[in-house]
Amino acid sequence: MLDSLKQKKNFQRIKMRIKTGDLVKVINGKDKGKTGEVLKTIPLENRVVVKGINLRTKHVKPTQEGETGRILTEEASLHASNVMFFSKDKNLTSKIEYFIDKEGVKKRRLKKTGEVID
């Protein structure tokens, strides 16, 4: 699927404000209201994988004789628009904005409270 995205003429990589390791809250879908840590971001598809959210079961056939099949549960990706950054300290969700501090370093902060993330 990634190859087909790259072959499009007007293809642009989407800038994601959510990073790996951020705590996010699901704002839409079957897991609405749950919070979890971002395990992986997929910027080419604008998707994120969140720990313990959007679980899928996968049935694996045995590969060798004497081995039994297994049922695995793994996290599937969510669209980035369905999650929002969650602040544990303030217990609220907020959009993220970028700013440049006095030393000239680009940082992220919450739009609602102004709390600096990193």
From Swiss-Prot:
PROSITE patterns: RIBOSOMAL_L24. CDD domains: KOW_RPL26. Keywords: Ribonucleoprotein, Ribosomal protein, RNA-binding, rRNA-binding. One of its GO terms (cellular component) is ribosome. One of its GO terms (biological process) is translation. One of its GO terms (molecular function) is structural constituent of ribosome. It comes from the Bacteria. Signal peptide: none annotated. Part of the 50S ribosomal subunit. NCBIfam families: rplX_bact (TIGR01079). One of two assembly initiator proteins, it binds directly to the 5'-end of the 23S rRNA, where it nucleates assembly of the 50S subunit. Belongs to the universal ribosomal protein uL24 family. This is Large ribosomal subunit protein uL24. It comes from Prochlorococcus marinus (strain AS9601). The gene is rplX.
